[in-house]
């Protein structure tokens, strides 16, 4: 019996680049701000989805289930110096995702991964790009300087991982129009600058 050879190359893996966190709690917004900056800087092939996951918790399971590989930006309490970036991959990820300090109403991303695993859709490849936060208690506050300074390195790490997975990553032309990730995005630079007048009036 002859087994027919599949026509054409295998389909490209479906990849999700995800930022999670709460921009209203200072450094907990790192993941969201990092994925926003990544989206503004690069264009990707059609098999890659970029998502601002915010604080959706278990609702993110549906997105994880629909993809084969996953890159996550997040603020993680590694117990390191604030502003330290740490990259954890594949089987090492679950032990770290539960360490993040989160608001009481939020579900940790570890539970999202556990739910995806239970449903038989755990990512075949997984990279967590985490940053040690300095401040998670400043309601309405911007990212602190050490955490904000990590964003360029976090973005370049995601680019390196994607290219190692065979993804074409292209820098957007300067001044190119970039569609928002969310319909009602809160602009990062405008949000961060709004704290400056208050500081000057102190």
Swiss-Prot record:
Not known. Could be involved in the processing of hydrogenase. This is Hydrogenase expression/formation protein HupD. PANTHER family: HYDROGENASE 1 MATURATION PROTEASE, HYDROGENASE 2 MATURATION PROTEASE. GO terms for molecular function: aspartic-type endopeptidase activity; enzyme activator activity; metal ion binding. InterPro entries: Pept_A31_hyd_express, Pept_HybD-like_dom_sf, Peptidase_A31. GO terms for biological process: protein processing. Ni(2+) binds at residues 28, 74, 105. Keywords: Aspartyl protease, Hydrolase, Metal-binding, Nickel, Protease. Belongs to the peptidase A31 family. NCBIfam families: hupD, hydrog_prot.
